[in-house]
């Protein structure tokens, strides 16, 4: 579909990509889709991918399981809706992909990225004045 991204209007869209373990992926997928349906947030493009074993990088996302990605129209309610969605994700220890993150809380990030402290040690060594930063790094405490 040509120019499919224009379906979301002038404010565009965000992507949410979550990592779901094999043991509860069907339940998490159903609960996720039901959650956004109840909130009247519809994804024109939703993808499901199977992942293999991840790597040892400090902020690595991949791990054995599945990813579910949703494209959601940006609107004034989406941040609040996401905060509620994060509570659902926490029940399943589901990881959110940093590259596609727009709203993840600092606490959720700290709870799900287990090697975060090692990353911070290295960043502090090479950037002690915290010159290298972004909106996301400020929000997540990097």
How would you name each of these model-derived features?
Residues 90-142:
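Activity-critical C-terminal alpha-helical subdomain
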Residues 1-111:
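Substrate-recognition/cap regions that form aromatic- and gly/pro-loop-enriched pockets
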């Amino acid at each position: 579909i040509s120019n499919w991204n224009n379906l979301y209007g002038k404010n565009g869209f965000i992507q949410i990509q979550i990592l779901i373990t094999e043991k509860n992926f069907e339940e998490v997928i159903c609960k996720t889709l039901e959650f956004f349906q109840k909130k009247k947030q519809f994804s024109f493009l939703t993808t499901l991918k199977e992942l293999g074993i991840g790597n040892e990088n400090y902020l690595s996302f991949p791990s054995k399981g599945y990813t579910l990605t949703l494209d959601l129209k940006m609107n004034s309610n989406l941040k609040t809706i996401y905060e509620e969605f994060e509570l659902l994700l926490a029940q399943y220890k589901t990881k959110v992909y940093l590259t596609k993150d727009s709203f993840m809380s600092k606490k959720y990030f700290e709870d799900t990225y287990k090697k975060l402290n090692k990353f911070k040690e290295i960043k502090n060594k090479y950037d002690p004045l915290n010159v290298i930063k972004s909106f996301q790094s400020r929000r997540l405490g990097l």
